[in-house]
C-alpha cells in the first residue's frame, strides 16, 4: 500500500470495496476550505508523467512546471513532482500532459506532494475571477472562519465564526454560486460573513458584503 492511501482518510476520501468493486467518494468542499486545509496550493502545468509502481496500487508521478505557489512555502518552496494513485477508483487523479495549467492542492508526506480526486484540482481557465482573487489573499484571510455545510433545511450558523454554505440546496448543484464567487472572511465585530468579489449581486445569499 502506498503512502497516499494513508492520506486518503485525511482528505475525506474513502475507497470502498476491494479490487474490482472499488469506488472513490468525496465530501463536497468549498474552495476556501480546500485552500486552508491543504499543505500545498500551486498553479502548474503538467509536462510529463510516469507509472512508478505496477499492480493494483500503482502510483502515478506527474512532472510539473510550477507557475505560482499560493500556500506551502515553508513546507515545500518548489514542487517538481506530484504523486497520486494510478487508479481513479482509489481517488487517483488524471491530468492532461502539456495541455493546460491547473490549480493543484495537496498534502506533503515524507517530502513529497500527494493529491487526488478529493482535493480541489481545477483547470486554471475554469476558475472564476473571484476564485483567483481568493487564492491570492481572500481565502487566507478566512482560514480562521468556519464554513458550515447545509444539505437540507432548516440549517443555521451557531457561532460568530461560521458562514452557512448552501450550494448543495441549489437546483444547479455543486459547485454553486458561493463556491464560485464568495469567500468567508472575518468582518468588523469579529463576525465571519460571505464576501463577494467580482460577481454581480446575488440577493439569494444572505449575510453577504460587497468589496
Swiss-Prot record:
Disulfide bonds: 24-91, 26-118, 36-143, 145-192, 150-155, 163-184
Binding residues for Zn(2+): 24
Signal peptide, first to last residue: 1-23
Involved in metalloproteinase-binding as annotated region, ranges: 24-27, 88-89
GO cellular component: basement membrane; extracellular space
Principal location: secreted
Annotated positions for site Involved in metalloproteinase-binding: 37
Mediates interaction with EFEMP1: region residues: 105-188
Residue stretches making up the NTR domain: 24-143
Reported consequences of knocking out the gene: Timp3 deficiency results in a failure of liver regeneration via sustained activation of TNF leading to hepatocyte apoptosis. In addition, Timp3-deficient mice show abnormalities in the choroidal vasculature.
Keywords: Disulfide bond, Extracellular matrix, Metal-binding, Metalloenzyme inhibitor, Metalloprotease inhibitor, Protease inhibitor, Secreted, Signal, Zinc
Matching Pfam families: TIMP
GO MF, one example: zinc ion binding
Induction of its expression: Highly induced by phorbol ester (PMA), EGF and transforming growth factor-beta 1. Also induced by dexamethasone.
Record localization: Secreted, Extracellular space, Extracellular matrix
Gene3D superfamilies xref list: 2.40.50.120, Tissue inhibitor of metalloproteinase-1. Chain B, domain 1
GO biological process, one term: negative regulation of extracellular matrix disassembly
Expression sites (tissue/organ): Highest levels are found in kidney, lung and brain followed by ovary and uterus. Low levels are found in bone.
PANTHER family associated with the record: METALLOPROTEASE INHIBITOR (PTHR11844), METALLOPROTEINASE INHIBITOR 3 (PTHR11844:SF22)
Similarity field: Belongs to the protease inhibitor I35 (TIMP) family.
Subunit: Interacts with EFEMP1. Interacts with KDR.
Function: Mediates a variety of processes including matrix regulation and turnover, inflammation, and angiogenesis, through reversible inhibition of zinc protease superfamily enzymes, primarily matrix metalloproteinases (MMPs). Regulates extracellular matrix (ECM) remodeling through inhibition of matrix metalloproteinases (MMP) including MMP-1, MMP-2, MMP-3, MMP-7, MMP-9, MMP-13, MMP-14 and MMP-15. Additionally, modulates the processing of amyloid precursor protein (APP) and apolipoprotein E receptor ApoER2 by inhibiting two alpha-secretases ADAM10 and ADAM17.
Protein name as it appears in the record: Metalloproteinase inhibitor 3
Biological source species: Mus musculus (Mouse)
